[in-house]
Curated annotation (Swiss-Prot):
Topology of this chain in the membrane: Multi-pass membrane protein
Organism lineage string: Eukaryota, Metazoa, Chordata, Craniata, Vertebrata
Keyword Transport part of the UniProt annotation: no
Side of membrane Cytoplasmic, spans: 70-82, 141-160, 224-294, 351-514
Subunit-level organization: Homo- and heterooligomer. Heterooligomerizes with ADRA1B homooligomers in cardiac myocytes. Interacts with CAVIN4.
Keywords, comma-separated and alphabetical: Cell membrane, Cytoplasm, Disulfide bond, G-protein coupled receptor, Glycoprotein, Lipoprotein, Membrane, Nucleus, Palmitate, Phosphoprotein, Receptor, Transducer, Transmembrane, Transmembrane helix
Family recorded in the similarity comment: Belongs to the G-protein coupled receptor 1 family. Adrenergic receptor subfamily. ADRA1B sub-subfamily.
Membrane-crossing residue ranges in chain numbering: 46-69, 83-104, 115-140, 161-183, 201-223, 295-318, 326-350
Lipidation (S-palmitoyl cysteine): C364
Name of this chain's protein: Alpha-1B adrenergic receptor
Length: 514
């Protein structure tokens, strides 16, 4: 959607070019003896610099938003799918529309012909419509998240989110394709003129479908979010929220920073503690409400940026006396474009998760690739393993500071101690185990397998052997030997063959935090 910036332009050269000095033209087929380039005044140079920086920032910022979700599994939620869709729409606008809008603004005329002008205007409407419809979907998603915080994972699934996003783009295409099918005013005689479609009925149709109807849905949803949030917060803090009577089994997946926990909450049984259930509800609700606040800021900025344009466009198309001056229309038009670079600023300022994701990406530390690189670099370095107490699985417990020393020291003549770990009920029985030490092996080579000795005090089981055993490579299993002074005095069942330890485990180990 671009304004008709120069409707009176009928010459073959731009009116804003400076005078050609020292130009001695001797004939139509002869060149000047001392030709010079058009002068570029300071104001126009500043405009080029500002518009170029604005477009570059919009492109880089929206790419960061997309990569943040793609490189962080805990950010791959249905809500963030809508955010990614919004970023894709803004990125498409920044790539395919803003450069040509800036060219039109700087040169003062269109240089790519009539057909491409129509395509460019349609893509403009498509991207802007997809942006606000994505915000409309986000507002509905936030209402469901706040109103039904516990049932949200089952109500809003990945499949439903993808279907909603497809619907957004289909509806946006329907609204934007009208001018390409002939629903527009007659084209001007000069192909160097290019602007928005000001056919009155299409201007009204596109304004309603692209802005006003989605805006009404957004306002209604966020009003309901505010009412529900206020009432639910009051009830939860007072501790009078009733337990759900119809739920038989509920699975909660709680994501807090980098901490992931799966818990199972069974039916109302004897000994059920209402306070713990209320605490879980309060945690879930607080998280959903915080997300609603962040996205509310995004919606508010979108309305502030695009509302002036969608007021000026239909009024100017329906009533010629109300058409704003060209200078005013340019301002409100570029104000709408300015919204494309605001969202990448809002997300890291309002969400610590997005801020950390941005910092990792800017530091070239996309999570998946970073783990693989650290695995290769560390080789046989000692890592901390902590058995996880939920569901009988093992989980990493190494802190970020301890995961990798700045010196990159590995097990070469040094001794590293693993902190005490809470054993998994499914494997280690009850009780807390003392610290387990990994002894230094001077001949330990990179790539050697790393494991833990059998935890002391483990209850015997008839159906399984030892959890961790070591054996010589290429030889049958044999009982281990007691540690001696050469290995730091640790009690292990380890022997070395050709500088590498053998390893056998009857239980899978979760890798450390790479």
């Amino acid at each position: 959607m671009n304004p008709d910036l120069d409707t009176g332009h009928n010459t073959s050269a731009p009116a804003h070019w400076g005078e050609l000095k020292d130009a001695n033209f001797t004939g139509p087929n002869q060149t000047s003896s001392n030709s010079t380039l058009p002068q570029l005044d300071v104001t126009r140079a500043i405009s080029v610099g500002c518009l170029g920086a604005f477009i570059l920032f919009a492109i880089v910022g929206n790419i960061l938003v997309i990569l943040s979700v793609a490189c962080n599994r805990h950010l791959r939620t249905p809500t963030n799918y809508f955010i990614v869709n919004l970023a894709i729409a803004d990125l498409l606008l920044s790539f395919t529309d803003l450069p040509f809008s800036a060219t039109l603004e700087v040169l003062g005329y269109w240089v790519l012909g009539r057909i491409f002008c129509d395509i460019w205007a349609a893509v403009d409407v498509l991207c802007c419509t997809a942006s606000i419809l994505s915000l409309c979907a986000i507002s509905i998603d936030r209402y469901i998240g706040v109103r039904y915080s516990l049932q949200y994972p089952t109500l809003v699934t990945r499949r439903k989110a993808i279907l909603a996003l497809l619907s957004v783009w289909v509806l946006s295409t329907v609204i934007s394709i009208g001018p390409l099918l002939g629903w527009k005013e007659p084209a001007p005689n000069d192909d160097k003129e290019c602007g928005v479609t000001e056919e009155p009925f299409y201007a009204l149709f596109s304004s309603l479908g692209s802005f006003y109807i989605p805006l009404a849905v957004i306002l209604v949803m966020y009003c309901r979010v505010y009412i529900v949030a206020k009432r639910t917060t009051k009830n939860l803090e007072a501790g009078v929220m009733k337990e759900m009577s119809n739920s038989k089994e509920l699975t909660l997946r709680i994501h807090s920073k980098n901490f992931h926990e799966d818990t199972l909450s069974s039916t109302k049984a004897k000994g059920h503690n209402p306070r713990s259930s209320i605490a879980v509800k309060l945690f879930k609700f607080s998280r959903e409400k915080k997300a609603a606040k962040t996205l509310g800021i995004v919606v508010g900025m979108f309305i502030l940026c695009w509302l002036p344009f969608f007021i000026a466009l239909p009024l100017g198309s329906l009533f010629s006396t109300l058409k704003p001056p060209d200078a005013v229309f340019k301002v409100v038009f570029w104000l709408g474009y300015f919204n494309s670079c605001l969202n990448p600023i809002i997300y890291p300022c309002s969400s610590k998760e997005f801020k950390r994701a941005f910092m990792r990406i800017l530091g070239c530390q996309c999570r998946g690739g970073r783990r693989r690189r650290r695995r290769r670099r560390l080789g046989a370095c000692a890592y901390t393993y902590r058995p996880w107490t939920r569901g009988g699985s093992l989980e990493r417990s190494q802190s970020r500071k301890d995961s990798l020393d700045d010196s990159g020291s590995c097990m070469s003549g040094s001794q590293r101690t693993l902190p005490s770990a809470s054993p998994s009920p499914g494997y280690l029985g009850r009780g807390t185990q003392p610290p387990v030490e990994l002894c230094a092996f001077p001949e330990w080579k990179p790539g050697a397998l790393l494991s833990l000795p059998e935890p002391p005090g483990r209850r015997g089981r008839l159906d399984s052997g030892p959890l961790f055993t070591f054996k010589l490579l290429g030889e049958p299993e044999s009982p281990g030997t007691e540690g001696d002074a050469s290995n730091g005095g640790c009690d292990t069942t380890t022997d070395l063959a050709n500088g590498q330890p053998g390893f056998k485990s009857n239980m899978p180990l979760a890798p450390g935090h790479f």
